[in-house]
């Protein structure tokens, strides 16, 4: 699967969270987004209320971060990012 096949877009929530990141956090995030573009199935597919959403886990400075996204034909929508604490509760609230 070619990474140039996908267009990346983001929700306002994702944009607000990334705006608070430091430069090195953004660089790590960019690498992880490239990994998702290369293999959109890399994230765990969610069920129930979050059906159609995938969550990719990665570490930054020993802290695990979760990146929620969805894939539609030629677009990857970055939904939200954060640590595990209250992550799924907040994600469900945003998706509804």
Question: Where are the model-predicted features located?
Answer:
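Solvent-exposed, flexible loop/coil residues
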Residues: 12, 46, 50, 54, ...
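A cross-family signal for key residues in well-ordered alpha-helices
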Residues: 30, 37, 79
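Arg/Lys-rich, positively charged N-terminal/basic patches that mediate binding to nucleic acids
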Residues: 1-32
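A short, surface-exposed loop/turn module that caps and links secondary-structure elements
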Residues: 34-61
